[in-house]
């Protein structure tokens, strides 16, 4: 099992999290096993993160399909400075920080 991590500006996280919970509850996120959200607790990061957990981390095409589905269904617009989303798994070795990546075509002037 692994997870897609989608960062959001902290000022939008509550609104997005509410929407994600509704979609999950109504089975609108196929094959998503569970979801988690970073807390609103103060931290040094300007972004919060929503995690989407999926099985089949060895099937790159399927996992990337799930990642693209999240981008489409959530109409994902990344925060400024974010140019990709990452799929992480416990099976990733010490030499690598993520298993898969989806590059986002974004113009930082249009983000946030």
Predicted regions and their residues:
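Extended amphipathic alpha-helical regions
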Residues: 1-112
């Amino acid at each position: 099992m692994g997870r897609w991590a989608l960062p959001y500006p902290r000022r939008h996280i509550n609104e997005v999290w509410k929407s994600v919970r509704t979609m999950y509850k109504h089975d609108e996120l196929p094959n998503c096993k569970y979801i988690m959200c970073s807390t609103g607790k103060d931290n040094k990061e300007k972004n919060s993160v929503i995690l989407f957990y999926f099985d089949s981390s060895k099937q790159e095409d399927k996992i990337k399909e799930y990642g693209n589905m999240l981008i489409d269904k959530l109409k994902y617009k990344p925060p400024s400075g974010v140019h990709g989303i990452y799929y992480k798994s416990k099976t990733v070795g010490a030499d690598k920080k993520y298993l898969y990546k989806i590059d986002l075509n974004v113009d930082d002037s249009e983000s946030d």
